[in-house]
């Protein structure tokens, strides 16, 4: 289980987030641009440090301001799919996916087996030699996810993984994305602003405003209006403001 209780002062507001995500659970983090969603992912990944608080995985602290613990990003074993995918444009699809394994010093033969299995599962084996700069948006998304998954991460973080795709490709990718993530059976957080992602991918959804979690429901509850009888008027308006279906 991933447990987060952190505070960080930002330019326009203070980020204060308290969350827990179970193994195998996909949490959808929903909110407007600039509300702190990506910052929270970066705090979990170790790319930025909270001012105070604690982040732990299965009871082991990876950040604790009181105990002066701040595990390096590399040692946190996190698979991170950035919004722009962050593939190396001059490298082939194969080399991009193999990159994390090579930094761990695995033998080439083992890397070959693992990368082939991952590329075949992602439907990318046929374009393994293509440079990342020449493949489609959907292929980049699959390659970025394959690179994140192949290292057998303890946590998966995905920042707007479908935003660069057109609407038709987004619809086709949602089911595949959920299946690929669930194979890992680790706590996963996906940042999105689209309730279609919540409906098709997530197990639970949290809404963030100005650095704070203002609403948390299961994905089914979020999408099933009949179950919102106990929701406040403001909560319903918040959900409706993101509904695009």
Regions found by a protein language model. Name each.
Residues 131-135, 139:
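Conserved ABC ATPase signature
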Residues 60-65, 102, 109-127, 178-182:
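Conserved ABC ATPase "signature" region
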Residues 150-154:
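A short, proline-enriched helix->beta-strand linker immediately N-terminal to the Walker B motif
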Residues 91-99:
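Short coil-to-helix segment of the ABC ATPase nucleotide-binding domain corresponding to the Q-loop/switch region
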Residues 185-191:
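Conserved H-loop
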Residues 156-160:
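Catalytic Walker B motif of ABC-type/P-loop ATPase nucleotide-binding domains
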């Amino acid at each position: 289980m991933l447990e987060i209780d952190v505070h960080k002062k930002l330019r326009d507001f203070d980020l204060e987030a308290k969350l827990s995500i179970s193994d195998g659970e996909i949490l959808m983090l929903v909110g407007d641009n600039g509300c702190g969603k990506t910052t929270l992912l970066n705090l979990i990944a170790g790319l930025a440090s909270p001012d105070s608080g604690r982040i732990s995985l299965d009871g082991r602290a990876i950040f604790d301001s009181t105990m002066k613990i701040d595990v390096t990003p590399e040692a946190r074993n996190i698979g991170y799919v950035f919004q722009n995918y962050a593939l190396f444009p001059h490298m082939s699809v194969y080399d991009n996916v193999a990159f994390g394994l090579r930094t761990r010093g695995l033998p080439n033969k083992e890397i070959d087996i693992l990368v082939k299995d991952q590329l075949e599962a992602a439907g990318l084996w046929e374009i393994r030699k293509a440079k990342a700069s020449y493949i489609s948006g959907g292929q980049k998304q699959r390659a970025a996810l394959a690179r994140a998954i192949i290292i057998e991460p303890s946590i998966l973080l995905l920042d707007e993984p479908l935003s660069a795709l057109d609407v038709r490709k987004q619809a086709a990718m949602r089911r595949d994305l959920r299946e690929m993530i669930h194979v890992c059976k680790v706590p996963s957080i996906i940042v999105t602003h689209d309730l279609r992602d919540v409906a098709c991918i997530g197990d639970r959804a949290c809404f963030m405003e100005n650095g704070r979690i203002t609403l948390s429901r299961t994905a089914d509850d979020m999408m099933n209006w009949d179950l919102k009888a106990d929701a406040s008027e403001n909560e319903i308006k918040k959900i409706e403001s993101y509904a695009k279906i």
